[in-house]
Amino acid sequence: MTQDYDNKRPVLVLQNDGLYQQRRSYTNEDEAWKSFLENPLTAATKAMMSINGDEDSAAALGLLYDYYKVPRERRLSAAKQEHDHADHEHSKRNGLPQINEQALLPDNRVQVLKTVPFNIVVPLANQVDKRGHLTTPDTTAAVSIAHPIKTESQSHCFSVGLQSVFHTEPTERIVAFDRAVPSDHFTSNNQPPNSQRRTPDSTFSETYKEDVPEVFFPPDLSLRMGSMNSEDYVFDSVAGNNFEYTLEASKSLRPKPGDSTMTYLNKGQFYPITLKEIGSNKGIHHPISKVRSVIMVVFADDKSREDQLRHWKYWHSRQHTAKQRCIDIADYKESFNTISNIEEIAYNAISFTWDLNDEGKVFISVNCLSTDFSSQKGVKGLPLNLQIDTYSYNNRSNKPVHRAYCQIKVFCDKGAERKIRDEERKQSKRKVQDVKVGLLPTHKRTDITVFKPMMDLDTQPVLFIPDVHFANLQRTTHVLPISPEDMEGELNPGMKRLPFSPEEDFNTPPAKLPRVDEPKRVLLYVRRETEEVFDALMLKTPTLKGLMEAVSEKYEVPIEKIGKIFKKCKKGILVNMDDNIIKHYSNEDTFHLQIEESGGSYKLTLTEI
């Protein structure tokens, strides 16, 4: 029985082959390979097969060629000894092959074929791979694998122990081993417990098989994870604790217990904000490294959406121009070297793209005070926050991967510096008392504020867009997922992606009321040339008629006798005064007033000082 078994050579059986049940063995194997021995596999033939992408076939034919070059008697004797020893160890090690010690002698420079089931994938002719020259695997078969006995150079093969059961390879779980893996990495003695459920795939070097992404591990092993969903590992390096944002501005020297650190800003002044990646992934080059961040000014208190929109609308109604924004970004060269795709997505928010492999830097100014949201005088202003949300292009979600904030207080006319000086003065006075009383140590002045991370990533921020400009703003519903091919180079500047959904962010109450703007008042400071003190002329309406009424009331000049009114600029240009000059270019200006009477009418000349 054993001799008959040795005379049979292993065969390749396809599962979906019609002759699957009709197995037969070839006893006269020397005649079967006689033609092959007469036409040996030359180096040129191997090179041509490698160029055509069939390196594995070249390796297999070379293995068979070396096997059948050996005389039949030596081959049968070596195979019999190996077979007897392997059958004894087969039941002990659950079918794992063992190599005989005799086969490792220097004289045995052959490779013995063992009938160990090993799965390869046979491609069908009607399915073509995405790359064109490779085919998509479809059928799994059990073939024999050769154990390296002795070669002249270092062997690149490895032995794999598998259960002797023929089964179809599940398409959802594939493990592909590289041919360059050393033999000591994968042997029959160090297989993991679940190795029986992982059958080696074909060694075709396909990058994509049935749209399953391939994950590369340096330097010599690549795993194609078919059972893992793409959302589980795509952009896995972007985690909530991997970002840090810093604002270069002065912080309060007297923080209140339990409150966040207060940062003082001047209205309209630009401050740099640096965005970078930190943690264990710092320094690792990301193949897809673009992220989008949104910097916005929001209210610190937990106010409802309606209250926030009401405050923003009140602030916007009191601005000199409808184009006034709550937050602006500077076009500094230092900033634009690190960011791209800048979008003013709302009056209180700015979006841009930056690279994780480099630090992003932007210069931001805030144009609203904390006291601008109420008409009452002397009330404490509403606290404001600078909030930064960072979104990944790969997580296919409108939920940010990181969110952080810092509390700010905005002053006008260099008020931030005055506030810091006042706190320093109070702190210096307290130091004298601390020496005697021994109070808590004072805080040192720092000009760097680190944004504090937020755990709530689900709440959508309120973005303010005035009704008059709502239709002109470019925005979309969600962050659109983009393929890695689109991210290889610079993102297309024309791509407009917002991480917000517009559902009810900017909806106004059902009953809209027209906004009634209070008439703008113009104040002029005038004096006669013979006088030293200025008089204030308050124009009830910013028109030429309003100016005539104010002059008539102040200097008792009959309004019906006032003729021409001129304005003399600092350059000496004399122009006719009209409504536009009074409304837009004369508020709180100082003038010399000259009143001349000629022919029963008065001519007024306002000379700009």
Curated annotation (Swiss-Prot):
UniProt-listed GO biological process terms: regulation of transcription by RNA polymerase II
Region (Disordered): 183-207
Oligomer and partners: Binds DNA as homodimer.
Main location: nucleus
Protein's cellular compartments: Nucleus
GO cellular component, one term: nucleus
Additional facts recorded: GRHL genes (GRHL1, GRHL2 and GRHL3) show a paradoxical lack of redundancy despite their extensive sequence identity in the DNA-binding and protein dimerization domains and the fact that the core consensus DNA binding sites are identical. They have related but remarkably different functions during embryogenesis because of their differential spatiotemporal expression patterns during development.
Protein family membership: Belongs to the grh/CP2 family. Grainyhead subfamily.
The protein, known as: Grainyhead-like protein 1 homolog
Span list, region Transcription activation: 1-91
InterPro entries: CP2 (IPR007604), TF_CP2-like (IPR040167)
Annotated TM spans: none
Upper taxonomic lineage: Eukaryota, Metazoa, Chordata, Craniata, Vertebrata
PANTHER family associated with the record: GRAINYHEAD-LIKE PROTEIN 1 HOMOLOG, TRANSCRIPTION FACTOR CP2
Ranges for region Interaction with DNA: 371-380, 418-421
Grh/CP2 DB domain boundaries: 239-465
Described purpose of this protein according to its UniProt entry: Transcription factor involved in epithelial development. Binds directly to the consensus DNA sequence 5'-AACCGGTT-3' and modulates expression of epidermal-specific genes, including XK81A1. Important regulator of DSG1 in the context of epidermal differentiation. Regulates the maintenance of skin barrier. No genetic interaction with GRHL3, nor functional cooperativity due to diverse target gene selectivity during epithelia development. Functions downstream of BMP-signaling cascade modulating endogenous bmp4-responsive targets.
Disease: Defects in grhl1 are the cause of defective epidermal differentiation.
One function term, GO molecular function aspect: RNA polymerase II cis-regulatory region sequence-specific DNA binding
Keywords: Activator, Developmental protein, DNA-binding, Nucleus, Transcription, Transcription regulation
Superkingdom classification of source: Eukaryota
Bias (Polar residues) ranges: 185-206
